[in-house]
Amino acid sequence: MTSRALLTVTGVDRPGVTARLFAALAEVGGDLVPVEVVDVEQVVVHGQLVLGVVVGTRPAEGSRPGEEARFLAALGRLAAEVGRASGVQVQVESVCDAGRDAAPAGRSHHVIVLGRPVPPEAVAGAAAAIAGIGGNIDAIRRLSDYPVTSFELTVSGAEATGLRSALASVAATTGADIAVEQVGLTRRSKRLIVLDVDSTLVRGEVIDELAARAGRAAEVARITAAAMNGELDFAESLRARVAALAGLPVEVLDEVREHLVLTPGARTLIRTLKRLGFRCGIVSGGFTQITDPLAEQLGLDFAAANTLEVADGRLTGGLVGEIVDRAGKAHALVRFAEQHGIPLEQTVAVGDGANDLDMLGLAGLGIAFNAKPYVREQAHTALNQPYLDAVLQVLGFTREEVLDAVPTSSSR
């Protein structure tokens, strides 16, 4: 029978503690029987070390009775020596050989808790919700402390649907964002991201800016409200709003584009993902006269949007070509993924509106960004932070990895 023991080291972190512990373990093995390292976890939190090591030994046939007791006694002497030499505390306890096999059944998931700041009740609520559906938190690590604080909990023994349902109420009552992602290679294998433009990549709605310059803001607002109430579909409402722009000088498009304000964190998100090898693009129900120059400015790989018809230097109030609506956005995602040879499960889509839902559902990860409740409820996960680069934490990237990927002189 294999004898196993857990050594727990705590104290002020300093160079050489881990090396001294494992060197001492090697000597124990030499004195008795070979010692094997079964498991190791180490974390340093604000200079305080917590190191856990599970070691085991398998006595040879014909070994003397009491071998396990001698093994534990040797580890006890080791703990005292390492503790004195390193200024740390080392505890030793026997553990069950089947301890690792006793973990809850089910696939593991990452639960990401984000906030500005993260209140204790958010972590408490998440932990209670996880335990309430039979899950277990195996590990916690901080992903970022800026621009949002975020923590990643590795959870076993709970299914994604149950986790999302249990955590949704916690997010609603605490104001924190809580995302769920399955542990595995697919999380870090994402290779393409598609972003909505209005109220996602940029602040505000381009068509509202154009309508204001045309003196038709109130009319366009009424059409938008009718669409939101289900009285018009997106294509009908788009045509009606574009018709209200008839006669507007084409130069106004340049003026509006020059005054666009990127959502905070947009440049950081795109630059980081580009340096990590992502294909990045935009899919918009807006207009190519705005989105194409924006895509070029940001170094994006692709863009899809509607095209305003122009005649004699003025908008005609019509559109050219196929309309990019809810279905059109989803088709664009599929087209871009196929062009770059990337499976849909390795794609990410980010948007805020109902016309983004098909795209969010098709992507491997669909993120509702500052969206209305019915959009948040149907997306894989939701972010209500003002910073677009919080998407990086949902993907599992730490603040340190982001800083390594983006030059410090870059603007957000």
Predicted regions and their residues:
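Residue-level recognition of short loop/turn positions
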Residues: 196-198, 229, 312
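A metal-dependent, Asp-based hydrolase signature
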Residues: 209-272
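A conserved regulatory-domain signal marking ACT and ACT-like small-molecule sensing domains
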Residues: 1-190
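C-terminal cap/substrate-recognition subdomain and adjoining C-terminal extension
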Residues: 247-365, 369-412
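Active-site pocket-lining segments that scaffold enzyme catalytic pockets across diverse folds
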Residues: 157, 198, 267
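Asp-based phosphoryl-transfer active-site loop
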Residues: 190-207, 352-355, 360
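Conserved active-site and cofactor/substrate-binding residues in soluble primary-metabolism enzymes
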Residues: 12, 16, 20, 66, ...
